[in-house]
Amino acid sequence: MLKVTDLSVKRGDNIVLENVNFNVHEHKLISLVGPSGCGKSTLLHSIIGFVKPLKGLVELHGKDLINIPIEKRSIGIVFQDNTLFPNLSVRENIEYGISTWEKGHRDNRVNELLDLVGLRAHESKLPHELSGGEKQRVAIIRALAPQPKLLLMDESFSSLDPVLRHKLREEVKEILKSLSMTCILVTHDRDEAMNFSDEVIVLNDGRVQQYGTPSEIYLRPANQFVAQFFGSGNIVAENCPSKLREGYYHKVEISDEGEVETIVVRKVFSNGFFYYDLQIPNSQTRFNHIACAHDFALEERVKVDLCEAWSFLDS
Amino acid sequence: MKYLSIASILLFTAYAQAKSLTVYTSRKEHLVKDIFKTYEKETGVKINYKTGKAGALIQNIKAELKDPKVDIFMTVDAGNLWYASSEGLLESTKSDVLTSHVPAHLRDRDNRWFGLSVRARTTVVNTNLVKKGTNISYEELAKPEWKGKLCLRTSKKVYNQSLVAMLIGTHGYDKAKSIVKGWVANKVDIFSNDTNVLKAVAAGQCAVGIVNTYYFGRLIKKQPKLPLAIMWPNQKSYGVHINVSGAGIVKNSKHQEDARKFLEWLASDEAQKQFAQVNMEYPILKTAPQTDIVKSWGEFKPNTAFNLTDAGKLQKKAIKLMHEVGYK
Amino acid sequence: MKLVTNKKVGDYSYLFFSIIALLPIIFLFIEGKDIPQKDIESWTFVLNDVVPGLLKNSFQLVILSIIGSSLIALPLAFILELTDIPARKVWNVTTVLPLAFPLYVLAFIYVGFFEWAGPVLTFFREAGFDTLGNMKFKNAFGVAFVFSLGLFPYILLPIRLVLKKVDFKLYQASRSLGKSDGHFLKKVLLPLCMVPMFAGCTIVGMEVMADFGAVSVFNFDTFTTSIYMAWSSLFSLGSATRLSLMLLTFSLLLFFLESHISKRQVPLISNESQEAFFKLKLLPKMAALSFLGIVTFFSLILPIIQLVLWSYHAWKNELSANYFSLIKNTLMLAFSVGGSILIISLILVYAERNKHHKRWLPLFRSFFLVGYALPGNIVAVGVFLLFMNILGTSPMEMGLALVIIGLTYRFLSVGHRTISPTARLINPNFEKASKSLGKKRWTFIFKVWLPFLRGNAIYAFLFVFVEVAKEMPLTLMLRPIGHDTLSTKIYELTSEGEWERAALGALFLVILGMSTVLLMSLKGENHAEGH
């Protein structure tokens, strides 16, 4: 439904996006993820029209958006913060985009959306009287009020504290799914990208690195950057034991029957799982971010099983 | 050694202060500086003076009254002189010289102050716009023929307050009110000083203005080619409104004798000549000579019927009247 | 165990002195209640004949000036904050420099410029435009014109501060929601400007009511000129007192109105986006630049040129020994008042250092600072009455001390608010630490506290210095005779229409004013906010 072809965007003297290509299908939740400065916000801005591309095509439902002004594109956007009109109440903020609707119809729509996020009781409050999470909820339903074809979210959860972030993300995902909305979320948070979306676009240095489902990204990273960014394994460097092939990407699993011996060099506990960095002794080879429920100690010897190996050059 | 020099300094200053007078005057410094110096040279009495606005000077004298540092209060306009005396700030002075040199209508009825020079508040016309021989008077200017032709100084200046006080004293409150009302009804242009009134008349903005004679003298001296001329008003009736600059001895002054002598000197031949000359005014002493410029304005009939003491008495009424008719 | 701790003594002293500070106002009420016999005639005249006109004039002036200032300030704020107009840094300075001109200086410049024999009307007459050429400038519209040019920054700055905080993303959000620029303007931008604009308008109202010098030049009767007239011509202290009470009521009303309005400001989060909202096409850009140019011309360039031209004509005659004594008096007064305010402010701020949580502090502190909210004429009458009652005789005996005390009372707030915010940042633990090390209180004050505040103290001194140099009504009323300052001399000269002679001194004051305005804008302080 949204097709981006050979998009290149310049900001000042720098080329921020180069030959970006992807196709977003309707009703899908997409994450646009990458490190800071990789151009993801610029990509969003090009889609919505805040920025004019150097070359390339942005098409919505087959129509070239290049000459359509922002007001007419029917694309909604939710920013990271500071998004609500400070002098208008919650209700007035939501009504803003649908002010031309007939009153009854408009009121119903607003009520419906307020109920969706459980903020009906706060409808007369001003933005500064709301908490961070409440503000973002309002920002989201405000953007949804005029029934846009596409919703863009620019780091919309990034300014919230972790617990709230997680909760809100789930809530919003449910809402978007129930409304069958197509949504692109820009985030620098890998977990967020993996958990929120149907598909992930990985961006680095203005270029698309990979576009696929979360499990594809995680299990079959297309290149070194994607692999390292999602921390899901390692390319074998040098001096590797015979079972491992040089220059290849290896997917490993901790197992008692494992063939390769490693030492725990780093240990992180997150979300109920332990994530270990395991190093093959006397070697530069290191497997990062290997998940396991078992609690190993640092320096402990752990056996790993080779699951898969492939070379980026093949794919 | 230190104490000796201190003692000698104190002695010296005490001696130096032996013969001196202090004058508070609202006259501009350059108008009185030389006269004071002349007196000093002649008599050895030093004149210390402070200049300021009449109202402020009066407040200061009031404050010092129990133990005044000042001996003489010198100011312009009978209104100010009357106010000082009515507040009890001036002594009644017995002096034959003063009573003979200063006509009765130009000094306080109780001799608390004496006029020292005379100025007339006269009408001045644009010679291109007003024919010679036109009958002109303060009352005449209220008539509709003069609509759009009159320029006046602001009512806030004491000279105009005394002029209106004179009208009240001469005609009574109601008639005076209708006269001033007539001025205002003639769309009079208001200016902040007499010189600007004269300039406006010369430029043709209006045909006639009312100013003090010495302002006319000063301007005409600088720019003799201006189409301006004095046309003495009220020559067929009571005469031109005159006012004085004058002085009185401050009550409880510590140098009453010297102060009296100084006043007498100011009212006598030599001082009168200088006094009148420096500001192109008329001397109070009839026998003192006028400057040539002043003489060139010709003889005129002054209003001698109105005692200037009353100008002060009626000042408040005059302010009220001007405010009522909207004379700004 | 001490029954009365040091802290309590400190609190009670502060309260005591703050009541003392309120005495001038208290005496205004005491003396104004009953009118002395000799003043009754004057007062009846004033009350019945003068006051209705004053009310009408004041009302007219305030409304017209507010309208004029807003018409300049609101578009200017939009142009400067929301568009990509070139040379923004230049305009930032030129739109705030008009504050350097005392209103009475702007007044006589324009009265002289637009008088019948002046350049503009003469030109019109010679060109054949008789109605234009005979236009009268000395009316409410003329005064409002001058006030608008001199006071619009008080509305401009608060609006700009609010607009600065409007995130560019809000505009983007509005567009993404399908709404036009006009809709965004109407629904978000303009409503956000209303609170700062109204707050600025009340400040303009206060300045208009308090002005004495400018309305005097225009021969326009207001409360301040009537107070002065009662004081100096009618010699009716009773009338002056009662007029002061009336004006006091209006001033306090406006003051509380401003506080009330400011509280309604919706809190805005600071934003860092630098992007200009509206990128103007050529024609609107030209229009905006022209508007900026016209405002700058009339509020800044023309006045300066006129002052310089007049000064040039007059300087040979004016620059006599007399002038140097005027400058000397002005500087001496400014210096001594600056010094006394500095010392008193420091004492006050030190006394307040541990009291900020106390609920009574804001109220009693305002007693010390109320002088700034009141017109100079009122403060003069109040201080005069205070000392008349203390001394039993005319306060004029106090000489220079009277006017120094009056000016200190008037401008104490300027010193206090320059020092207080920074002093509050000093951690109270410093003093405790110093005491625990066995050092006396004075050691702490001179080695730690004062050095910390050195920069602010210098600024406080400078700001007060300039305010005193420019001040006119209070100095006029309370100074000893013969002791003229530049401002009082300008009053005397302009009341006689002597524009040229007044220009030289005025130029000096304007340059002085400009240096502080520039200093303030460099320091980032907002003059309008602290008023």
Short names for language-model regions:
Chain B
Residues Y3-F12:
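Sec-dependent N-terminal signal peptides
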Residues F12-A18:
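Sec/Tat signal peptide C-region and signal peptidase I cleavage site
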Residues D292-K328:
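Extracellular/periplasmic bilobal clamshell ligand-binding domains
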Residues A18-W82, K328:
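Early extracytoplasmic/lumenal segment of secretory-pathway proteins
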Residues G79-Y83, A202, A207-P227:
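A ligand-binding cleft/hinge motif common to bilobed small-molecule-binding domains
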Residues S245-A305:
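Mature extracytoplasmic/periplasmic domains
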Residues S26, H30-K33, K69-Q205, Y238:
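Extracytoplasmic ligand-binding site segments that recognize negatively charged/polar headgroups
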Residues Y214-G248:
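A beta-strand-loop signature enriched in Asp, Gly, Thr, and Trp
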